[in-house]
Every structure is written in structure tokens, then in C-alpha cells.
């Protein structure tokens, strides 16, 4: 089987550590994503910053003085991939009470590893939607400065949510009086939280419009932020030049978020025909996490959470090890085109 080399050239563009001199790569095959054609024997030339300066047939390319092309004439090259739903500072093996023992600095260190794995898996741009303590902001800045190897990142910092909701931490008893950084109640408090996360470096705003699977005390399909709260968040974010992404499994929460002016809906697990029509009408992006369930197993989240997960997906396999879902939203997206559909993995890290 012909070797496929993912993101050959954009891989290097987004890794400042990789560059100090111009270079070139000779590709046996190169996917032209604009035309949809697979081109043969192409030369990709880039400058010292990693920016591509030319793509042309190898026979007609004159290389800059002193540049010797990397020979990948037995490989297929394609542009870098984009993942619009990641949590790179998280550990896929830490759920429930085990998360309480992980410090914010430790999550930042985990992010360094996951960013490297993500880039080497072929993803050169990611949107990170939800991280404790602005660890994703620090990771993004480290990558931009050339201190850390990783993809271009658009980050949200802490996700915004209601008290006791999916974006809160509900694991500690009442005497601790603990709540997550993004908790807000009411439209004005929600506006203030938008301003706060933008102040500390958020490129995008992440909110929880519905309950989730891995959070204690809520249900995946239950609405959380009200329509009025989400309208305030969207208005404030847009005023500050930021887009808003809403975690939403439930049918009603999906439609409320779209009506509120939210820019993208994450998961869309129980979207119905009306929700799809609303998304088309409002120009809302639907983001389906294609790899969320394979990330989870009985060993990592337990039977209880897997049972909750089964309420919002149609399992192809319900073995005690892994459950591979047929996400209803992604099927609906294909059937109800044309609407704006994007793919996120929900992955915390890619396999080595």
C-alpha cells in the first residue's frame, strides 16, 4: 500500500522550531484540495519562516541556492487537517474524582505532549474549546513563540456554564463552596464572564447549553443556559470580535442556542429536522465529534457514564470494553445538506 504522508508541508509551517532555513519537499503525489485532483511529482518550496512560496511540478522547479529537496517521491502529500473541537490540556484517562488531583500546571504539561502528538497526527490547526485555568491560552502562546511544538490554536479558556451544570465542577460537597471558573447566572453575569475570558486571552467563547455525559448531577439532553443568557453571551462576544461555540446534546438546547445567535453547536446529538432547518436559516455551524465515544471505556469513565452516553447515541457495539457510536447528528447533516457542517474529534490527544 502506498505510504500516505499527512500534512507534510503545513506540518512544518506551524512548527516554528522546525525552521531556520529555506527548504523544499518533493512529493510523489500531492492532493490539490481546490481542484480535487491528485497531482504527480510535485515540488513544494518554503522559506525560512516555513511559508510555502511555490508548488509546481518537480521538473520545472528551480530550487533556491543551497536548498536540497527532501525526497518523498514515494509518498502522498496533502494540506494540514483542521480539528474544530479539542481539549488538548486534558488527560483522556482522568474522569470523575481522579480529576480533582490534577493541578493546573500539570494540565499545562499534559497539553505540551498532546499538542505535539496532534501536530504529528497531521492536524495543523485546532480549536480548543474548554480548559481549566487558561492552560490552553498558555499552550497557544508557547506554540506561537516557538517554545512548544504544536498546531495553530484558537482557544477558549474556561467554558461558561450554569451553577451545577456540565461546565461546573460538581464533585465536591457543599462545605468546599467550589465552582468552576466559567460559572455565571443571569444575562449580566454571563456578559461579565465573556469579558473576563477575553481579557485573559480567549480567541473564542465556549458555553454549555445542555447537560453532558461526564458531569455529575445533570442529564445530557437537559437545557442549561437560558435563551436570554445565551443571547447576552452571543451579543457580548460578537461585540468583542469573538465567536461562540455551544456544547449542546439536547434537541431544545440546540434550537435555543441557534436562536440566541450562537455561531457553532457542538455534538448536536439529538438534533431534529427543525434544528437542522434553523441552522441552515441562521448560518450556524454544526460540529459533530466523530471520535468521542471510542475515547471512552469502562476503565476510564465507568458503566454509569457509558449508560448515560448510550441515551444519546446508537451503539454499534455495546461490549464491556468499547462502544462505537453511530452519531445521529452526523447522519442528519449528510441527509439534510446543504448546511454548514464541521468535524471535531473531542479528542484530548491523538494516538502515538
Report residues per predicted region:
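Divalent metal-dependent hydrolysis catalytic cores, especially in the metallo-beta-lactamase
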Residues: 110-136, 150-159, 202-215, 243, ...
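Boundary at the C-terminal end of the N-terminal hydrophobic targeting segment
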Residues: 18-23
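N-terminal low-complexity segments that are often proline-rich with Ser/Thr-Pro
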Residues: 303-352
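Histidine-rich, glycine-flanked metal-binding segment
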Residues: 30, 35-78
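Active-site mouth loops of central-metabolism enzymes
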Residues: 97-109, 173-192, 243
Amino acid at each position: 500500500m502506498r505510504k500516505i504522508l499527512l500534512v507534510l508541508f503545513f506540518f512544518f509551517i506551524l512548527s516554528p522550531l522546525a525552521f531556520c532555513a529555506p527548504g523544499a519537499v518533493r512529493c510523489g503525489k500531492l492532493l490539490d484540495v481546490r481542484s480535487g485532483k491528485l497531482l504527480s511529482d510535485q515540488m513544494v518550496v518554503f522559506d525560512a519562516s516555513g511559508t510555502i512560496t511555490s508548488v509546481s511540478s518537480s521538473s520545472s522547479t528551480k530550487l533556491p541556492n543551497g536548498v536540497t529537496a527532501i525526497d518523498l517521491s514515494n509518498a502522498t502529500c496533502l494540506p494540514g487537517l483542521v480539528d474544530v473541537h479539542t481539549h488538548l490540556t486534558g488527560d483522556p484517562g482522568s474522569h470523575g474524582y481522579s480529576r480533582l488531583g490534577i493541578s493546573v500546571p500539570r494540565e499545562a504539561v499534559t497539553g505540551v505532549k498532546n499538542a505535539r502528538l496532534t501536530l504529528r497526527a497531521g492536524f495543523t490547526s485546532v480549536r480548543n474549546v474548554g480548559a481549566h485555568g487558561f492552560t490552553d491560552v498558555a499552550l497557544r502562546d508557547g506554540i506561537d513563540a516557538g517554545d512548544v511544538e504544536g498546531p495553530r490554536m484558537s482557544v477558549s479558556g474556561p467554558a461558561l456554564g450554569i451553577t451545577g451544570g456540565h461546565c461546573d465542577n460538581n464533585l465536591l460537597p457543599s462545605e468546599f463552596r467550589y465552582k468552576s471558573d466559567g460559572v455565571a447566572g443571569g444575562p449580566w453575569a454571563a456578559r461579565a464572564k465573556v469579558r473576563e475570558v477575553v481579557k485573559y486571552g480567549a480567541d473564542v467563547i465556549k458555553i454549555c447549553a445542555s447537560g453532558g455525559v461526564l458531569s455529575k448531577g445533570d442529564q445530557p439532553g437537559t437545557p442549561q443556559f437560558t435563551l436570554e443568557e445565551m443571547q447576552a453571551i452571543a451579543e457580548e462576544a460578537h461585540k468583542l470580535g469573538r465567536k461562540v461555540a455551544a456544547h449542546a446534546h439536547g434537541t431544545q438546547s440546540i434550537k435555543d442556542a441557534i436562536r440566541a445567535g450562537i455561531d457553532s453547536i457542538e455534538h448536536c446529538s439529538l438534533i431534529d429536522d427543525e434544528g437542522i432547518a434553523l441552522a441552515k436559516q441562521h448560518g450556524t455551524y454544526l460540529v459533530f465529534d466523530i471520535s468521542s465515544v471510542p475515547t471512552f471505556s469502562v476503565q476510564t469513565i465507568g458503566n454509569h457514564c457509558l449508560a448515560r452516553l448510550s441515551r444519546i447515541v446508537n451503539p454499534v457495539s455495546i461490549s464491556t470494553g468499547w462502544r462505537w457510536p453511530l452519531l445521529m447528528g452526523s447522519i442528519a447533516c449528510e441527509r439534510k445538506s446543504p448546511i454548514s457542517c464541521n468535524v471535531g474529534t473531542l479528542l484530548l490527544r491523538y494516538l502515538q
